[in-house]
């Protein structure tokens, strides 16, 4: 039987639970921010039969997987549970969990669950088509992936769950609840519900009332890095952590990732290169975009918000290109003992900037209010095999990802007045040295690449450490622990080439969107309700 831990201050390690879209991880860090061990398990979010767009989160199975990861991490680290000073949790944003009056989780969905497309359209028509603008003005979110249409969907289609609902939280809060029995949300993750006021960092209950929904189901709000509770006896027996270990409020994956990268001061900017690419800029005070092109999220740093733009499927597009067209390069890379992307980058480095005018059409710049993309394609190909080949297309894709990022950063600067003087490039994309240099050349900014490129779990561990007094504050610790791998300075000649390429791409992309509007091609992705 697990024993009550009464000396958590003697622990020498911190644990971060990271619930991503495709997997859950338990990561153990020492008090210098060094990663010691990881337990990881993939999970799937399955569609409900006859519910188009649904992506349910399997609460029972996924908790078992989380416990498995915790046990695995402890075993790999070869440390006792008493060595863990504190635990915190982070997760994909937008996903929500519903609880009944007994505190039992009864329903959950993952981040891009799109079942409520009809409800999104219905809500947009409220108050002479101004309801979404009011939601955005208050919360920095549109309705597409917010909790409001999902709750309305439950009221329409699952009234049994809707009427039993007593509390709603995010997925990170659910993991913390399963550990401690305490229910609360933090602003950085709960902000993506579209129900949190950017100024007060608390719930805006009137938005639910305006939608004709119940406003009595909102959890207490606690800031990241504060004490939530302690590991319960039940949780200790399930996952082998020590009962009584402090559980600290965590947050949203992107904001905690920025904390782990030291992006904690006003005007600091980051490009996070994963399956999706996010371009984030810290703002000193809450402000929203009059054109509703970008989302605004609470940072984990109190009083600070982040503008966030998203490039769709950027990393996924690169994987598609590698797997669909580069079987030969994958075999060669395997024989050489290197990553296939490294080989493709080496090939692409011999292609001149501008990639002979090839224009990839994949993700658009972010248009949060009316969010959809053109059909995937390559434009302006040549039939000269010396100029148009796999290396050229690969370089064109890397250049295009940087161009979309630059356009998104320009949109942010236009309404916020905040101009970046450098940026941090992290995530899987930042492993590419050519890609990092292209990003510098396209944006005209110095690009800093950290040693720890996947920093979400580190940011979560920082929250845990601050919560038990290991470190003094979130911002100070994030800056202290980040280490830099390399720096890329922009090449002025390449910058001029990319300025022209960017202007042409923007014009061509608008024509490609028009083909989607005319029903002639199929969008890469459309937001629910369009």
Curated annotation (Swiss-Prot):
Instruction: List localization entries.
Output: Cytoplasm
* Domain of life assignment: Bacteria
**Catalyzed reactions:** (S)-4,5-dihydroxypentane-2,3-dione + ATP = (2S)-2-hydroxy-3,4-dioxopentyl phosphate + ADP + H(+)
Q: Which UniProt keywords apply?
A: Cytoplasm, Kinase, Transferase
Q: Name one GO biological process term.
A: carbohydrate metabolic process
Mind telling me which Gene3D superfamilies this protein's record contains?
3.30.420.40
User: What EC number(s) is this enzyme filed under?
Assistant: 2.7.1.189
Question: Where is it chiefly localized?
Answer: cytoplasm
Task: List the record's Gene Ontology CC terms alphabetically.
Answer: cytoplasm
Q: Its Gene Ontology molecular function terms?
A: autoinducer-2 kinase activity
Please give the PANTHER family that the UniProt record associates with this protein.
Answer: AUTOINDUCER-2 KINASE, SUGAR KINASE
Q: Which family does it belong to?
A: Belongs to the FGGY kinase family.
* NCBIfam families reported for this sequence: PRK10939.1
What does the protein in this record do? Catalyzes the phosphorylation of autoinducer-2 (AI-2) to phospho-AI-2, which subsequently inactivates the transcriptional regulator LsrR and leads to the transcription of the lsr operon. Phosphorylates the ring-open form of (S)-4,5-dihydroxypentane-2,3-dione (DPD), which is the precursor to all AI-2 signaling molecules, at the C5 position.
What protein does this entry describe?
Autoinducer-2 kinase
State the organism named in the record.
Answer: Salmonella typhimurium (strain LT2 / SGSC1412 / ATCC 700720)
Q: Supply the gene name.
A: lsrK
């Amino acid at each position: 039987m697990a024993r009550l831990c009464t000396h958590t201050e003697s622990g020498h390690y911190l644990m971060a639970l990271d619930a991503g879209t495709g997997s859950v991880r338990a990561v153990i860090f020492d008090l210098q921010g060094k990663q010691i061990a990881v337990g990881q398990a993939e999970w799937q979010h399955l569609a409900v039969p006859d519910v188009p767009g649904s992506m349910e989160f399997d609460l029972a199975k996924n908790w078992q997987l989380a416990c498995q990861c915790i046990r695995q991490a402890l075993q790999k680290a070869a440390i006792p549970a008493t060595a863990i000073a504190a635990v915190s949790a982070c997760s994909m944003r937008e996903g929500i969990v519903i609880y009944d009056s007994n505190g039992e989780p009864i329903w959950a969905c993952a981040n891009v669950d799109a079942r409520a497309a009809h409800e999104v359209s219905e809500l947009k028509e409220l108050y002479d088509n101004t309801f979404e603008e009011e939601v955005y003005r208050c919360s920095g979110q549109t309705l597409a992936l917010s909790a409001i249409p999902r709750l309305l969907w439950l009221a329409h289609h699952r009234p049994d769950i809707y009427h039993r609902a007593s509390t709603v939280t995010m997925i990170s809060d659910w993991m913390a609840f399963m550990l401690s029995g305490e229910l609360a949300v933090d602003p950085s993750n709960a902000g993506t519900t579209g129900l949190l006021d950017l100024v007060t960092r608390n719930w805006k209950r009137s938005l639910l009332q305006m939608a004709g929904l119940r406003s009595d189901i909102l959890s207490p709000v606690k800031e990241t890095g504060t004490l939530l509770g302690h590991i319960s006896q039940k949780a200790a027996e399930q996952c082998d952590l020590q009962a009584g270990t402090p559980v600290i409020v965590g947050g949203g994956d992107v904001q905690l990732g920025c904390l782990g990268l030291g992006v904690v001061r006003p005007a600091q900017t980051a490009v996070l290169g994963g399956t999706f690419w996010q371009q984030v800029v810290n703002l000193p005070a809450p402000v929203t975009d009059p054109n509703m092109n970008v989302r605004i999220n609470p940072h984990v740093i109190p009083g600070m918000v982040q503008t966030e733009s998203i490039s769709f499927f950027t990393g996924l597009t690169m994987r598609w290109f590698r797997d669909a067209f580069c079987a030969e390069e994958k075999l060669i890379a395997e024989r050489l003992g290197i990553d296939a992307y490294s080989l493709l980058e080496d090939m692409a480095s011999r292609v001149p900037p501008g990639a002979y005018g090839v224009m990839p059409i994949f993700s658009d710049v972010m248009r949060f209010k009316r969010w959809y993309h053109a059909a995937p394609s390559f434009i302006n190909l040549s039939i000269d095999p010396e100029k148009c080949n796999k290396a050229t297309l690969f370089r064109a894709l890397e250049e295009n990802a940087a161009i979309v990022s630059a356009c998104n950063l320009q949109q942010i600067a236009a309404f916020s007045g905040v101009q970046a003087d450098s940026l941090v490039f992290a995530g899987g994309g930042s492993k590419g040295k050519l890609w990092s240099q292209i990003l510098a050349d396209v944006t005209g900014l110095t690009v800093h690449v950290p040693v720890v490129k996947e920093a979400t779990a580190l940011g979560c561990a920082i929250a845990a450490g601050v919560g038990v007094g290991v470190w003094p504050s979130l911002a100070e610790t994030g800056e202290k622990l980040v280490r830099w791998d390399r720096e890329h300075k922009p090449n002025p000649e390449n910058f001029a080439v990319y300025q022209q390429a960017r202007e042409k791409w923007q014009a061509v992309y608008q024509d490609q969107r028009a083909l989607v509007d005319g029903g002639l091609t199929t969008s890469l992705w459309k937001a629910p309700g369009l």
